[in-house]
C-alpha cells in the first residue's frame, strides 16, 4: 500500500516513461477503482478487515473490533500464513490472537530522547509564534515517529532497503506482508530519484512512488519469490491538489489498484471494470484460492452503482454516504444517498 496515490497521475507516469515500460507486466491495473474512504484513518483498517466504520462506536473501538474480526486475517490464519504488518501509525491492541509476528500494538519500543526533543521543540516554537509570523509559517510534518525504533514508511528509506540489502530471509511456510509506504503523501518533498527537495510536484512524487514499487517487484524476482507470490499494489486513497475545483475533492476516492496472481504471466493489462474497495474481501479469497487477476471481479460491469463514505478531515464524527453510476473520475455524477452516520447521535 502506498499513500495518497491517485490513479490518473500514476497511469500517466507508468504509461509515458520508458523506465516503467515492463515494470508492471503480469499485473492487471484496475484504473476505475473507487476506495471506500478518502482518508488513511478509516481506509487502512477497512482494507485489512473488510468491516466498515459507520460511526457506530468511537474510532478506537471500531478499529480494534474490525481487526479482531478481519475476514482477511481469518482467511490467512485458516491457511497457516505467517502474518506481518508494516505501518508507521497502525496501533492495534488486538485481543484475538492472529499471531501477527510484529504486532505494532504489542511491541516494546525504545524512545530516542534527542529526536523526541527536536520534534517537541518544533511544535512549541510554532505554537508560541506571534500571530503575524504564524501566518507566514507552517509545519508540514512532525516526525514523532522518528523518536522510536520502528518501521519507517519513507519512500527513500524503503527504496534503499529494497536495493541494498544483500539477502532476504526465506522460509518454506506461507507468508503475508502488509507494507504501508509513504507513496505520494504530502508534503511534496521528493523528486523522481528519491531525493528530498522543497517545492516538489505531485508528478515527481508519483514517479518516485512508481520507482519504489518497481524496486520491490525486482527484489522479489531477484530472490526467486516473485512468481509464487500474490501481489496487490494499492493506495489507501487518492489525492486532491491544492486550489482544485470543489468537486475535485472526490479524486481522493480513485486510488491505484494493481493485482498479480500466482504464476501469472502477461503484459500489463489495463481494466476499466468499475471496481470498489467493497469488492476486496471476495477478491482476497479468490486470490488465496489461486485465481489470476484477470479472473477477478467476474460479475462486475457497467452500469453499476458504487458507494463511498465521505467526511471532512478532522470532522470524522459526521459521515455522509455518496453513490455514483459513473466512472471514478466523473465527480459530477456523485450524489448523496441520504445516509448520514453521525457519531454524536448514536
Predicted features and spans:
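Active-site-proximal alpha/beta segments of enzymes that process anionic O-linked groups
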Residues: 4-192, 286-288, 293-301
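Metal-dependent active-site segment of extracytoplasmic phospho-/sulfohydrolases and closely related
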Residues: 19, 208-249, 281-285
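Short, solvent-exposed loop/turn segments at the edges of secondary structure
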Residues: 41-42, 252-254
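Active-site rim elements
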Residues: 58-63, 197-204, 242-244, 264-275, ...
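Membrane-interface soluble catalytic domains
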Residues: 69-79, 91-100, 106, 218-224, ...
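Short beta-strand segments
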Residues: 85-87, 176-183, 203, 230-235, ...
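Active-site-proximal segments of metal-dependent phosphoesterases and phosphodiesterases across multiple
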Residues: 190-213
Amino acid at each position: 500500500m502506498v499513500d495518497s496515490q491517485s490513479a490518473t497521475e500514476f497511469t500517466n507516469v507508468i504509461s509515458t516513461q520508458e523506465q516503467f515500460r515492463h515494470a508492471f507486466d503480469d499485473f492487471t491495473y484496475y484504473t476505475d477503482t473507487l476506495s471506500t474512504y478518502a482518508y488513511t484513518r478509516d481506509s487502512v483498517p477497512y482494507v485489512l478487515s473488510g468491516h466498515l466504520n459507520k460511526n457506530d462506536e468511537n474510532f478506537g473501538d471500531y478499529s480494534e473490533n474490525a481487526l479482531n474480526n478481519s475476514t482477511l486475517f481469518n482467511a490467512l490464519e485458516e491457511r497457516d500464513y505467517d502474518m506481518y504488518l508494516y505501518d508507521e501509525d497502525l496501533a492495534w491492541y488486538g485481543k484475538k490472537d492472529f499471531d501477527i509476528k510484529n504486532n505494532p500494538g504489542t511491541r516494546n519500543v525504545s524512545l530516542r530522547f534527542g529526536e523526541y526533543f527536536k520534534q517537541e521543540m518544533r511544535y512549541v516554537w510554532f505554537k508560541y509564534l506571534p500571530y503575524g509570523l504564524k501566518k507566514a509559517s507552517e509545519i508540514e510534518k512532525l516526525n514523532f515517529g522518528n523518536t522510536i525504533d520502528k518501521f519507517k514508511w519513507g519512500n527513500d528509506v524503503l527504496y534503499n532497503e529494497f536495493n541494498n540489502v544483500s539477502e532476504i530471509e526465506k522460509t518454506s511456510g506461507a507468508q503475508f506482508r502488509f507494507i504501508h509506504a509513504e507513496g505520494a503523501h504530502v508534503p511534496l518533498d521528493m523528486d523522481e530519484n528519491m531525493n528530498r527537495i522543497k517545492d516538489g510536484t505531485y508528478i515527481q512524487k508519483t514517479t518516485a512512488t512508481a520507482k519504489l514499487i518497481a524496486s520491490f517487484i525486482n527484489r522479489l524476482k531477484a530472490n526467486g519469490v516473485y512468481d509464487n507470490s500474490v501481489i496487490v499494489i494499492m493506495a489507501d486513497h487518492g489525492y486532491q491538489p491544492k486550489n482544485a475545483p470543489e468537486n475535485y475533492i472526490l479524486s481522493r476516492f480513485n486510488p491505484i489498484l494493481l493485482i498479480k496472481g500466482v504464476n501469472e504471466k502477461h503484459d500489463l493489462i489495463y481494466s476499466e471494470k468499475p471496481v470498489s474497495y467493497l469488492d476486496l474481501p471476495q477478491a482476497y479469497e479468490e486470490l488465496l484460492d489461486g485465481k489470476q487477476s484477470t479472473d477477478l471481479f467476474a460479475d462486475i460491469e457497467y452500469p453499476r452503482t458504487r458507494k463511498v463514505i465521505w467526511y471532512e478531515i478532522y470532522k470524522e464524527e459526521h459521515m455522509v454516504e455518496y453513490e455514483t453510476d459513473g466512472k471514478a473520475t466523473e465527480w459530477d455524477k456523485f450524489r448523496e444517498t441520504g445516509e448520514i452516520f453521525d457519531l454524536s447521535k448514536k
